[in-house]
Curated annotation (Swiss-Prot):
Name of the protein this chain belongs to: Elongation factor P
Organism in which the protein naturally occurs: Bacillus cereus (strain G9842)
Pfam families found in the cross-reference section: EFP, EFP_N, Elong-fact-P_C
Pathway recorded for this protein: Protein biosynthesis; polypeptide chain elongation
Chief localization: cytoplasm
Keywords tagged on the record: Cytoplasm, Elongation factor, Protein biosynthesis
Family: Belongs to the elongation factor P family.
CDD domains registered for this protein in UniProt: S1_EF-P_repeat_1 (cd04470), S1_EF-P_repeat_2 (cd05794)
Disulphides: none
GO cellular component, one term: cytoplasm
Subcellular location field: Cytoplasm
Keyword Cytoplasm: yes
Superkingdom of the organism of origin: Bacteria
Amino acid sequence: MISVNDFRTGLTISVDNALWQVLDFQHVKPGKGAAFVRSKLRNIRTGSVQEKTFRAGEKVEKAHIENRRMQYLYASGEAHVFMDNGTYEQIELGEKQIERELKFLKENMEVAIMTYQGEVLGVELPNTVELQVTETEPGIKGDTASNVTKPATLETGLVVQVPIFINEGEMLIINTGEGKYVSRA
């Protein structure tokens, strides 16, 4: 058990038989009445975000999420196969479980698989990934107003806005949290 006064961003808790990750929190001490903690939580299984208020000093159960380093091997129909580099154990995850992460996954990529009491919860991607541009319009010389962007399709099918000087075949660094272009690789 952990006190809500000890909340930190990224902490995983179990409330009402659901696993939640603390996205944001604020300790509030009103002039009249008891102090409380206002928090923004993300359900780990469904991805939904909810605001929840706790009384100051209230106890919640801390969920111990285990992260296992694994390598993405390949897709087989709707299943996606990952391998533990230490034990060579392979697990399959369905497309629905990793729908958002699929836009960033390449074969042989190292990721962290999140598990809770033996149940696979999902994939934790690195902060940035390198992906190749497979399709984009050519930049037109002289078309240089400030911050001009164009859509580019990457090798995983992800479409991002990139500066006009980016061409097909180039490797880009993409932020996985926002799904946006960072720089050339």
